[in-house]
Design a protein with these regions (language model features):
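A beta-strand-loop signature enriched in Asp, Gly, Thr, and Trp
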Residues: 176-180, 190-207
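N-terminal beta-strand/beta-hairpin edge segment
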Residues: 1-119, 129
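Short, surface-exposed charged micro-motifs
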Residues: 77, 113-115, 181-183, 194-196, ...
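Low-complexity, intrinsically disordered segments exposed to solvent
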Residues: 40-44, 50-54, 75-77, 81, ...
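Short, surface-exposed coil-to-beta transition loops
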Residues: 28-31, 190-194, 251
């Protein structure tokens, strides 16, 4: 009869772009992959592996970084567009461990989901659950982070690498980042945010959005107990957040904006925004 699915075993698979040392270079490799294609949906390829994966890439400072991925379960779906090009990728990891020079130390996660869609605008959605952060970074609110989420749409042609030429071209073509949902739940602190951002003529972030915070009073107390801020600064920060934001039970909502090199929370200037830096500058 007509097969419901066609399985294939792949001993080793390697994907990448450019040559090692070139801007935009990256490589990903995995072994012992099971791939399944369903004739009724030939544009979708389901993949799964329990073997470790490795990756290397050139970062924004033109330095080669490595990343090793170990997971109890690693599944993914690759979608091929009608033109034969890669259209979308989604992955799911369980009991995930990350190590390598791309990180300051080992990172563990109970689960990680990621998806990216390349059709027209680029849509990205990444969420990590029950993360254990590396001790090397001296985590502010402990080593355990409950949720880390970023869901965004990037308009304009995606830059091929982190260089002034590529990023300028993206900006000049009207490139924007629309953060539809960002979330960090870390200790008592629970922050969600959304906004739309771009780059100004001097390569500084510009845009606006809204952030909502819960557990901020408790988190300020933790920072004070760890001597990371003084009691006086803690009192000023607590009062400032409550004055600038709109109270809704235990939630504070804060409008923020980035313009002319200044980050403002409400009408108050909170930080100076510097231009982006590129390799060789």
């Amino acid at each position: 009869g007509f097969p419901l699915s066609v399985p294939a075993n792949i001993a080793s698979l390697e994907l990448g772009r450019s040559e090692k040392g070139d801007p935009g270079y990256w490589r990903w490799q995995a072994k012992n992959i099971t791939a399944t294609l369903k004739p009724r949906q030939p544009w979708l390829i389901h993949i799964q592996t329990t073997a470790h994966q490795s990756s290397e890439f050139v970062d924004t400072k033109n330095q080669l970084r490595t990343l090793k991925i170990v997971a109890r379960v690693a599944k993914g779906i690759v979608e091929i567009g009608s033109d034969g090009r890669l259209a979308a990728v989604s992955t799911r990891f369980e009991a995930l461990g990350l190590t390598g020079t791309a990180l300051p130390g080992p990172v563990l996660a109970a689960g990680l989901k990621a998806s990216i869609n390349f059709l027209r605008d680029t849509r990205i959605d990444i969420q990590g659950d029950s993360l254990r952060l590396p001790r090397e970074i001296d985590p502010l609110f402990g080593e355990n982070m409950d949720v880390l989420r970023a869901k965004a749409t990037i308009t304009g042609p995606l830059p091929r690498n982190w260089s002034r030429t590529e990023i300028t071209a993206w900006r000049d073509e009207g490139g924007t980042i629309d953060l539809t949902r960002g979330r960090i739940k870390w200790g008592d602190l629970d922050i969600t945010a959304n906004g739309t951002f771009a780059l100004d003529a001097r390569m500084r972030l510009q845009g606006s959005g809204t952030a909502s915070m819960q557990g901020h009073n408790e988190s300020i107390k933790v920072l004070t107990e760890r001597s990371m801020i003084t009691p006086l600064n803690a009192a000023a920060l607590t009062i400032g957040l409550n004055l600038l934001g709109q109270q809704d039970k235990d939630t504070v909502k804060l409008p923020f904006s980035a313009q002319n090199g200044q980050l403002k929370v409400g009408a108050v200037s909170a930080a100076i925004l510097k231009p982006l830096q590129f390799p060789g500058e």
